[in-house]
A protein has these predicted regions:
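Reverse-transcriptase-like RNA-dependent polymerase core
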Residues: 1-13, 31, 40, 55-56, ...
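Alpha-helical coiled-coil heptad-repeat oligomerization segments
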Residues: 38-39, 78-85, 89, 153, ...
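Metal/cofactor- and membrane transport-associated sequence elements
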Residues: 1-92
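A short acidic-Thr-Gly-centered motif at the start of a beta-strand
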Residues: 5-10, 52-58, 213-221, 292-297
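Mobile genetic element proteins and their domesticated derivatives, centered on retroelements
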Residues: 21, 33, 37, 51, ...
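Two-metal-ion RNase H-like nuclease active-site motif
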Residues: 167, 225-237
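RNase H-like nuclease module associated with reverse transcription
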Residues: 101, 224, 242, 254, ...
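C-terminal reverse transcriptase regions that engage the nucleic-acid substrate
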Residues: 19, 67, 94-214, 349, ...
Length: 386
């Protein structure tokens, strides 16, 4: 990028400030914005650098920024107008009114409920795959699906595969029910096979019948943190690594979920489950710290439900075991949180282990039962079809 000066063909210009399009521009904009909002009395969150918190007496405001898209929520309209005036005086910006659309996510408010959906984005994925007339299926992955890197012949359009797999990853922001299936196909993005493509098409066929579903957030009287965690054991046919998954509820609302292949091989099912417990406890620590910054501290221990008795025993019993001494770091981390009263690890029967949906393919009845527990609903009547 640039031009050649006729009189000084061997000279270069010194850049005095960042220009739009340069790789340094996003960082420069972020620093410029941060410096200004700090002068308004905001504090930058240590848990999330894109979150700014304003708390003075009875006035509270939260500001979330992603590049140049901003969400601002305040405790009063007076405070909102004051902050908007200050921001508009410093930066060229437009007030789009109440939150209705952010980063591809449609937001609808009805009474005391928020409905978050990416239904239009889901339909776009179906169209990009050329599957607008496909027949829907009841589940995104079959019960026997264990994809291998050697599954059949090479797929002839890896670019399309990667594009759709990446799009499905973004869709999991409001669709926790597909995260396990998406995680399984994304593992093979580097060298997709025909079987991997068939697995991806099954996810799209599932979306064909469920694209209307979205995430609901209700006003809740409870401020308790509750989590479910589960893991398969040596589920990957190539690496023999396990897949762990969890979901976290704040009151009655689902706020966090994950499905990931573990980074090491577990020597027992208890070890695989315990590593899953450590993962969700780490997430709970982050959420508790975030709530503390938001001036909403929790006073009660967060509950973690696990269906493996041995993993529960390890979390609270300070005994050294020959078979678990190699996972000492995770053991000490979880035990420390338990001893501090921050976390309690309790047993749940496997039939009611919601996190199963994040670690394996399930039969239709069980899948739909667990899906109904993930805050996924049809849109309110006034927004159906949007």
């Amino acid at each position: 990028m640039g031009f050649r000066h006729r009189e000084y063909p061997d000279h270069v210009c010194r850049l005095r400030k960042s220009l739009y399009g340069l790789k340094q521009a996003p960082r420069a904009w972020y620093q410029r914005f941060t410096d200004f909002v700090l002068t308004l009395g905001f504090c930058q969150s240590r848990c999330d650098n894109s979150l700014f918190i304003y708390h003075h007496g009875a006035d509270t405001a939260y500001l979330l920024i992603y590049v140049d898209d901003i969400i601002l929520t305040t405790s009063s309209d007076r405070l909102r107008q004051s902050l908007m005036g200050s921001l508009s005086g410093e930066f060229a910006m437009k007030d789009l009114g109440p939150l209705s659309y952010f980063l591809g996510i449609s937001v609808t408010r009805t009474g005391d409920q928020l409905f978050l959906t990416q239904s239009a984005y889901a339909r776009d994925i179906i169209e990009r795959a050329g599957m607008l007339t496909c027949n829907p299926v009841a589940t995104p992955v079959d019960t026997n699906s264990k994809l291998s890197m050697d599954s059949g012949a090479d797929f002839d359009n890896p670019t399309l595969f990667r594009s759709l797999a990446g799009a499905l990853q973004y869709l999991t922001f409001t669709r926790p029910d597909i995260i396990y299936a998406v995680q399984q196909v994304c593992i093979h993005m580097h060298a997709p096979k025909v079987d991997h493509w068939n697995a991806l098409k099954r996810i799209i066929r599932y979306l064909q019948g469920t694209s209307h579903l979205g995430l609901t957030i209700d006003r809740s009287t409870s401020s308790a943190l509750l989590a479910y965690t589960d893991a398969d054991w040596v589920g990957c046919p190539d690496t023999r690594r396990s897949t762990s998954g969890y979901c976290v509820y704040f009151g009655s609302n689902l706020i966090s979920w994950s499905s990931k292949r573990q980074t090491t091989i577990s020597r027992s099912s208890a070890e695989a489950e315990y590593r899953g417990v450590a993962n969700v406890v780490a997430e709970l620590c982050w959420i508790r710290n975030l709530l503390l910054e938001l001036h909403r501290p929790l006073t009660r221990a967060s509950i973690v439900y696990c269906d493996n008795i041995s993993a529960i025993y390890l979390s609270g019993n300070p005994v050294q075991h020959q078979r678990t001494k190699h996972i000492e770091l995770d053991i000490h981390f979880v035990r420390e949180q338990v001893q501090r009263g921050m976390v309690r690890v309790l047993h749940v029967p496997s039939r009611f282990q919601i996190a199963d949906i994040f670690t394996k393919g399930l039969p239709r009845v069980l899948f739909e039962d667990f899906r109904s527990s993930l805050s996924l609903r049809s849109p309110p009547a006034s927004t159906a079809g949007v």
